[in-house]
Each structure stands twice: as C-alpha cells, then as structure tokens.
C-alpha cells in the first residue's frame, strides 16, 4: 500500500528517490517524505502531507544533497494522515531514520516498554516505535545496524518492509521484509531499493527479491549481504526484469485506466499466446500440465482472493463446476483465514492476486499449505510473493497495471481461469470434444470482439454525463454475469464515489426493488443466455417503477433496447466467455462518469493498488 524507495551509489540520490516516488503513486498514499545523508554526514528528513509534488515544493529550498537516501509514500494505518505521522521517522537521538510498510501489531506493548527506558514519541505511528526499538537495541547491545535490525525484528509481531539509514554509517542502507514486498535493483556500483520494480526499471534490469524474514545490507561497491533474522547468510538469486519503461507511460491517453481498458485486446492475446492453439486444438497451461494428476484427482477447488480478483473467482466457479465438474468454493481471503475452514490434502486452493502481494491472500495460502492443500497461484507480477509461495500457477502476462481500479488484470484472470477449467474438463472428458474445439475458437475471437466494443467509447462518454447526478446505482445480472454486476458496481464506487450495489437479478424482488425510482439508475447486464427471458421480466419490473435503465445486450437485440434508456452492445459469444465482454462497457461507464465528476481516476481517494496490510 505504501511505497518504499532507496538509493545508494555515485549519483545524487534525491532526483532518483523523487522519480521513484512518482512511479509508486499508483499504490495509493496520503503523504510523502525523504531522508538523505549529505556529504557533511548530516541526516536530513523532509516530509509533507499530500502528493509527492507537495514534498518537492517543500524540499525545493532545502539541502537535498547526498548519494544515499530513502523515501516513502504513506497510506495511513496508525495515526491520521499529516506531516507529523509521515515517514521517514527519526530515532530519539536522530541518529537513525526509517521508512516502513506494514502493520506492527504489538507496537503499543513495545512503545510502553521504550517509554520506560526514557524514549519519547512525536507521532502516532507504529513505525516510530520500530526505529526507537532498533536504536535502543543498537545502543544497549553495542551492535552494528544490521544486527540491531535483526534483533529488534525478532521482537516484532506483524508485517513489515523497512529501510533504515544510520548517520554513523553513511555508506549503508539496511532493509528487511516480512509479508510486505521489497526488491533490490543492482546497478554499476550502486543499488536501488523499492516496494516493486517500477522505480527500478529505468536504471537496471537485474534484481533480487528479498524473502520473508530476510535482512539485506547494501553498501557501495560491495556485494549485498542477505541474512535471516538469526544471521544465517543467504545466497541471493539475481533475476532479470521483464518490465519495460514504456509500459509505465500513459502512451497518449489522459489516464492509465483508459490506457489499460484499451489495452485489453492486446493483453488477452498475450495471456493466450503459447497457451491456446487453434491449429493443434489445444489449451496448454504448464502449471496444469506439470501437475495434471493432482488436478484430476482433486475433490474440491477453493478459490481465495480479495476485491476484483474475488469477482474473477466467482465467474471461474461457474466454469469449474459446469465444465470440469469439480465442486468449487470462492472465499474472501480475509474471512477464509480466520474462520477455521475445513481443508484437506485433496483440495486445490487457487489464490488470485494482480500484485501477488495481497496480505490476506498470502495468509490464506499459508493456512491452506499448513493443511496440506495444493496451491495454484494466478497473478500478474513475476517473482511476487504468491508466485514464489504457490506450488504451481499461471501468470496473466498483462504488463504493469497502474490504475488503482483493476481492468485488464480482471479480464485476464477470468480468461486464465476459464482456460484452466476447460483444460481440466478435456482431460476428465467432462466436456464434449466438439464444444471444446468451439470454445477454443471463441477464445481466440475475444480480442477482436473487445475492439468492437471499444468503438462505442464515444457514445458511452456522451450518455455517462446524464448519470453523474446519481447518488446510488443498482447493477443486475444472472449466472456468469452476476459477478460482472458486482464488478461493475465496484468500479463505479472506486473511482466516481457513487454508491453502487450488484445483485443477482432474481433477488431484486427480495429487497432492492424498494429502491427503484427515477433517481435510481439500474444497469442491467442482459446478453442472450439461458436466463434471457427472465432478465427481460426483471427489466419490465424496473420499467413499471419508472427506473432508468442502462442495458448491456447482445448485438441485434431489439427487445431490451426498446425497454432501455441507454444500450451498449457486445458481440455474441458463449455464456462462459460473456463476462470478458460484458465487463468492458461497465469499465468505460465508470471511467467516464468519474472523469465528468472531476474525480482522480487513477488514484481514487483512500484506495491503494496493492493491499499489503491486513
């Protein structure tokens, strides 16, 4: 959620740190700060509430010299968003400075202990407790910074990614992580540190992903020293970044979200490349092929995810049960991990996360593994925690998704999970070969069909203006399109701040119908499908109560068009693939409403792209 950047080397650190913070803005934040050790050995901290630009303005007339520094964007957890609570934080003597992502659960116990030892606190944060604890350990045990960090973190309960500067050792950054991501970039006699690779890619493509409960010491012109908390030396594994700098630019679009919506034809092709082969009539997913027997003997699939990824899991549930004929449950990771679920070694747990770093999903994986389940990860970020923790998995390969509201990652997740369900079904012979071959052909047609939908962008922009007045919106769908209703409502909530709810259309009569009025727009997802006539009946019920209807229908449908105030069409496809098409108009609708309202589309208030705290 927060963002960490660090640099040590030959260049001036400040410009690199500020550029890195801008790269991390998509993660969500409410304040920013930087710490630098200047050539005279002074440790300077500058911070500001608001955007990184506010920090730049504040630091403009300050001493920002130095070739070593750390910087941070904060998303408030402990203490309100203000300059006092912003990171970095000094230690009591101002010898140390720290930045931190995560939550220290036992911070109050540690705080009271430190107060008894004469320490004072200037902020309300758990982070300040951590830097005071490290300084106290360093002083009382008479150890160096790396050892002090190791010893201090052994006392900590919770998740963290930290970076620490020591005024008395101006040639070293010490960092550590547990449950929150941290990556080191390797340059020529210099090192870069960040929460993810986006601030690093401009300078190097060689990285080390720091493991859980590992501490790394970075010094100029020396190899990184990586140890466990118990000081066991680890051998770093250097990876090559697949990310490119051009992927982090808007490419002529006004917002990253619009760029990412329009990228979906390409990203779906990328997700299918080498996996869906029409000539060979095959779906080849290596994560499935390498573990085929495990999938074929499983008695249950459990999908665990959060937010948009949970909606993708709900769609996949239909496909796993319809085609692979495997019972499937979909769980919120945050609930699953705490409710003592019954898990066995016969289960496959599919964990979905765009970032691969979602804290609750990682905790759910840990619980499932402890009970013997096989873990299959579906994520986008190569080398992420979920990718490294899972027994097997499948990358979505959509490239970096910068907009906080997920778009291209969602459709790729649905695609990959549908491909997996069909691959299992073919091996189990629970799908007719003719239908399987037909669906392979339809998968390949999806990108072209999305391009047709995107041609309606201007029309959606025009009628979106009419609905900016709305304070509440209901989204309705059935079957495979019910989770699309949930996703459409979430998109509108996230970026336009309009309250919206998704319901199964048949449930409208069990409560939501009481809300229908001229002031309550209703978005109905009504493509041709087995429940089409029932959806039409629902629309008639809305019309009878003077509700304003926006419908998503199959091309050529005149019946629903005549009942609707506004209609968006999608090309025909099989029911199991419809969500990949029907969600596109809802993404565009939410986007245009938010833009007309003047909302910050890419960085909506209070939201973070990667939820790395519980």
Language model region names:
Residues 4, 98, 164, 175, ...:
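Structural beta-sheet core signal
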Residues 296-438, 442-445, 525-570, 589, ...:
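Glycine-rich phosphate-binding loops that contact phosphosugars or nucleotide phosphates
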Residues 257, 548, 561-563, 573-614:
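Generic C-terminus detector
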Residues 67, 71-84, 279-292, 316-352, ...:
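Glycine-rich oxoanion-binding loops at beta->alpha junctions
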Residues 1-250, 254, 266-300, 338, ...:
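Conserved short alpha-helical segments that host acidic/polar catalytic motifs at enzyme active sites
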Residues 264-268, 272-302, 392-521, 594-614:
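Active-site phosphate/pyrophosphate-binding segments
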């Amino acid at each position: 959620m927060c963002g960490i950047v660090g640099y040590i080397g030959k260049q001036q650190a400040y410009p690199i740190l500020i550029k890195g913070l801008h790269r991390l803005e998509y993660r969500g934040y409410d304040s920013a700060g930087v710490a630098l050790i200047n050539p005279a050995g002074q440790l300077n901290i500058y911070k500001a509430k608001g955007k990184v630009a506010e920090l730049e303005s504040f630091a403009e007339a300050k001493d920002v010299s130095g070739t070593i520094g750390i910087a941070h964007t904060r998303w408030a957890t402990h203490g309100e968003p203000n300059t006092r609570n912003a990171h970095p934080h000094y230690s009591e003597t101002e010898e140390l400075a720290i930045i931190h992502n995560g939550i220290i659960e036992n911070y109050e116990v540690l705080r009271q202990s430190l107060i008894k030892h004469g320490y004072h606190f200037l902020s309300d944060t758990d982070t300040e407790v951590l830097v005071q604890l490290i300084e106290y350990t360093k002083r009382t045990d008479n150890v160096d910074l790396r050892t002090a960090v190791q010893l201090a973190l052994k006392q900590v309960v919770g998740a963290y990614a930290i970076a620490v500067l020591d005024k008395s050792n101006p040639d070293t950054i010490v960092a550590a992580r547990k449950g929150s991501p941290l990556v080191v970039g390797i340059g020529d006699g210099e090192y870069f540190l960040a929460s993810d690779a986006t601030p690093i890619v401009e300078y190097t493509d060689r990285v080390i992903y720091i493991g859980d409960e590992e501490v790394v010491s970075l010094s100029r012109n020396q190899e990184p020293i990586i140890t466990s908390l118990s000081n066991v030396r680890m051998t770093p594994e250097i990876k090559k970044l697949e990310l490119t700098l051009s992927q982090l630019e808007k490419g002529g679009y006004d917002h990253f979200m619009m760029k990412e919506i329009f990228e979906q034809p390409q990203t779906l092709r990328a997700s299918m490349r080498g996996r869906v082969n029409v000539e060979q009539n095959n779906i080849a997913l290596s994560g499935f092929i390498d573990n085929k027997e495990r999938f074929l003997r499983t008695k249950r699939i459990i999908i665990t995810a959060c937010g948009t990824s949970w909606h993708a899991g709900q769609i996949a549930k239909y496909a796993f049960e319809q085609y692979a004929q495997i019972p499937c449950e979909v769980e919120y990771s945050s609930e699953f991990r705490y409710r003592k679920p019954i898990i066995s070694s016969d289960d496959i747990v599919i964990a979905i996360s765009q970032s691969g770093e979602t804290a609750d999903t990682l905790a759910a994986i840990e619980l499932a593994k402890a009970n013997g389940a096989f873990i299959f990860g579906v994520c986008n970020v190569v080398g992420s925690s979920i990718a490294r923790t899972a027994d097997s998995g499948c990358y979505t390969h959509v490239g970096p998704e910068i907009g906080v509201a997920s778009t291209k990652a969602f459709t790729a997740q649905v695609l990959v999970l549908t491909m997996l369900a069909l691959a299992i079904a073919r091996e189990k012979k629970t799908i007719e070969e003719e239908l399987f071959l037909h669906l392979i052909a339809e998968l390949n047609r999806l990108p072209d069909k999305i391009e047709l939908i995107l041609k309606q962008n201007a029309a959606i922009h025009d009628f979106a203006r009419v609905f900016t007045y709305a304070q509440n919106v209901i989204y309705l769908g059935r079957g495979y399109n019910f989770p699309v209703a949930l996703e459409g409502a979430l998109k509108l909530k996230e970026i336009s701040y309009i309250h919206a709810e998704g319901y199964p259309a048949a449930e409208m009569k069990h409560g939501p119908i009481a809300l229908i009025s001229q002031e309550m727009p209703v978005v109905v997802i009504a493509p041709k499908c087995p429940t089409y006539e029932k959806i039409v009946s629902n629309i008639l019920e809305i019309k009878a109560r003077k509700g304003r209807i926006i419908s998503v229908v199959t091309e050529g449908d005149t019946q629903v068009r005549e009942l609707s105030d506004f209609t968006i069409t999608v090309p025909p496809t099989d029911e199991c693939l419809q969500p990949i098409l029907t969600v596109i108009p809802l993404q565009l609708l939410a986007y245009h409403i938010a833009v007309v309202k003047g909302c910050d589309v890419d960085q909506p208030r209070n939201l973070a792209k990667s939820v790395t705290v519980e």
